[in-house]
Amino acid sequence: MSHYRSNVRDQVFNLFEVLGVDKALGHGEFSDVDVDTARDMLAEVSRLAEGPVAESFVEGDRNPPVFDPKTHSVMLPESFKKSVNAMLEAGWDKVGIDEALGGMPMPKAVVWALHEHILGANPAVWMYAGGAGFAQILYHLGTEEQKKWAVLAAERGWGSTMVLTEPDAGSDVGAARTKAVQQADGSWHIDGVKRFITSGDSGDLFENIFHLVLARPEGAGPGTKGLSLYFVPKFLFDVETGEPGERNGVFVTNVEHKMGLKVSATCELAFGQHGVPAKGWLVGEVHNGIAQMFEVIEQARMMVGTKAIATLSTGYLNALQYAKSRVQGADLTQMTDKTAPRVTITHHPDVRRSLMTQKAYAEGLRALYLYTATFQDAAVAEVVHGVDAKLAVKVNDLMLPVVKGVGSEQAYAKLTESLQTLGGSGFLQDYPIEQYIRDAKIDSLYEGTTAIQAQDFFFRKIVRDKGVALAHVSGQIQEFVDSGAGNGRLKTERALLAKALTDVQGMAAALTGYLMAAQQDVTSLYKVGLGSVRFLMSVGDLIIGWLLQRQAAVAVAALDAGATGDERSFYEGKVAVASFFAKNFLPLLTSTREVIETLDNDIMELDEAAF
């Protein structure tokens, strides 16, 4: 039986009952897509995920890739390669990709809903199968000649990587020392060592791999502004046919041994270190590497957040299934009666608290990433939110650190609740949750740690934006608070949401005050650093609380209209989880606000030896 538990019903509810993505279908760039098509695709990809994709999930963990230092190659488990090929052969990697690359137009919200299933069933499958998405980025950024290479890469199913990190340049990307030397034929020779490269090699899975590499051209300045982006293939190739030729000078020199996500080969790559030059080509023939790479980074951050959320969802659903069947103890109200019947653990208060917490974050975070995705297509953003393309970009930029940072942190934390639901059984490899936890920890680390996300969120997405995008989202929340949504059944919850909004606005004001005070005392910036992660997490809870209440309002209307059977249970669950979150989590923002408003620099002034 598959470990993966999907929730297509909740996706459909978000997309078409709450967000109104259906309004963007059947016309314009999405004229070939209707609601039935989208529903069918979600059902089909969930079946693929539960079957062929999930089949190698355990084996890939127990028998991870093997590195051969003599050939500088990585050998993947055969079962895992079958899972990757099942996704590629079905064409799911091309959904939402430009038609010029063999793709089909699809709103990003639907695309990410489809991706959720692959990421929840076997996340490394999605990572290895990302070549078409990277080819699209090259197609958008490249020269006319490079656009042809992108088409070849997509048509021939090449693998791909993003190559930023170095041993001494992790979060501090601007410290990168890998250099690029221009050649007479217009190509560049890349020289240096990169580390922590996902899918750096994959044996015979792909005929070729192209690396998008950040390197510093000879004579360029320091920091991120001195970096440029290069296209570096594993094999040089015929530019007309794509047929692979000579081996290029980029080789795997190590594969990391990791806590989780083991089947994803995390590689050290050496460029130009083995007697063969590593030939690369400047992407777009412009020296604008970090800005270009952010096209890749933003896609990666959305993926990481969705991966974390997908993992939490299947973790919760596994825990729920277990709790419904596990009989243990009597009802708490009969605890002194030794003859009382034994009950399933879903009858116990703390198990219910835990399950509802898992449900709140699994479904609230799903709503978060889908809401964010509706700003990733100008046409969808205009129809769904009434915003122009410029504001849509700003709101998407604002939300990405929330999806990635909050999604990764909350999913990892709440997966421990999923494991706890299973008791001692959860600690065993007989159940998938211990692997979920190991696989999910990386999500708060790569593609920018949570602290990096929080600083980006405050300094760039709020301060530099002058609060424009934040004001839009806050305005939507305030509009909901002021509405009569819920037909009289959500008054208490809306009042709690209003207080939470005020608290988050107070946090933003406090952090802004510390930033302004830094003009006279630069150490005031430390207070921003001390409060930024807590602020990001609080914004996440605020938005989750709001989106759950939006769902509850829709559910109340459906219940009032006479929903029956499973549908009635579904909608009742939506009302219950929104109320639970409002009453149990939103009030906690008040204390977080108090902490942020009274921050001091005591720990920054403490001697390091005292830690």
UniProtKB/Swiss-Prot annotation:
Any GO BP: fatty acid metabolic process
Q: What is the effect of changing residue 171 to A?
A: Decreases affinity for eicosanoyl-CoA
**Annotated EC:** 1.3.8.8, 1.3.8.7, 1.3.8.1
- Cross-referenced Gene3D superfamilies: 2.40.110.20, Butyryl-CoA Dehydrogenase, subunit A, domain 3
Task: State the GO CC annotations.
Answer: extracellular region; plasma membrane
Give the pathway: Lipid metabolism; fatty acid metabolism
| Binding locations of FAD | 162-165, 171, 198, 326, 420-424, 449
The residues annotated as the active site are 447
Q: Read off the CDD domains from this record.
A: ACAD_fadE5
UniProt keyword Cell membrane, yes or no: no
The UniProt-reported impact of residue 294 to A is: Increases affinity for eicosanoyl-CoA
How does this polypeptide assemble, per the annotation? Homodimer.
- What is the protein name given in its UniProt record? Broad-specificity linear acyl-CoA dehydrogenase FadE5
Q: Upper lineage ranks? A: Bacteria, Bacillati, Actinomycetota, Actinomycetes, Mycobacteriales
